């Protein structure tokens, strides 16, 4: 079983600030100048959606890092000489990484769906159509 240190290394935390910054800049841009007042802060839904979006983007970034580590290992791009990669260095087995990819994908999907539901104010019709179109778009890329 891989150590927590190996999983943190595979998740590459130094890549997270860029993803988080993109979401925070988008959130700041979404606020109108009248919203930026200490007297009247945005409503709780804004912060809920922001928090869920941040969680989603963190899961997606970690998922991308895991997938990159796995793919480079399988193709042979990362060999035993790459001690900075968790799979190539032998700290994480192929079976463990596959399981982590499934778990992280599932978490990202669930939190992403929750984000869409909150963002559309639980309007199930809009949410279902939006999620269907996103799924259709993703499947067309694949």
Predicted regions and their residues:
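Transmembrane helix-loop junctions in multipass membrane proteins, especially transporters and channels
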Residues: 31-38, 69, 73-77, 117-121
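Membrane-embedded alpha-helical segments that form the functional core of polytopic membrane enzymes
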Residues: 25, 38-67, 129-140
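Residue-level signal for inorganic ion chemistry
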Residues: 11, 72, 93
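Short, Lys/Arg-rich, polar N-terminal cytosolic tail immediately upstream
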Residues: 1-9
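Intramembrane alpha-helical segments
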Residues: 85-142
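The first (N-terminal) embedded transmembrane alpha-helix
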Residues: 10-31, 106
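Hydrophobic alpha-helical transmembrane segments
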Residues: 8, 16-20, 47-55, 98-102, ...
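Acidic (Asp/Glu-rich) catalytic motifs at the cytosolic membrane interface
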Residues: 59-83
């Amino acid at each position: 079983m891989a150590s927590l240190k190996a999983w943190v290394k595979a998740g590459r935390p130094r890549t997270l600030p860029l993803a988080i910054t993109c979401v925070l800049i988008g959130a700041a841009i979404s606020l109108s100048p009248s919203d930026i007042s200490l007297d009247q802060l945005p409503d709780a839904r804004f912060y809920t959606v922001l928090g869920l979006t941040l969680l989603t983007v963190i899961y997606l970034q970690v998922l991308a890092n895991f997938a990159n580590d796995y793919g480079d290992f399988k193709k042979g791009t990362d060999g035993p000489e790459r001690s900075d990669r968790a799979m190539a260095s032998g700290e994480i087995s192929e079976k463990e990484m596959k399981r982590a990819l499934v778990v992280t994908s599932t978490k990202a999907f669930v939190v992403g769906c929750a984000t869409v539901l909150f963002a559309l104010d639980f309007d199930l019709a809009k949410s279902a159509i939006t999620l269907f179109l996103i799924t259709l778009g993703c499947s067309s890329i694949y």
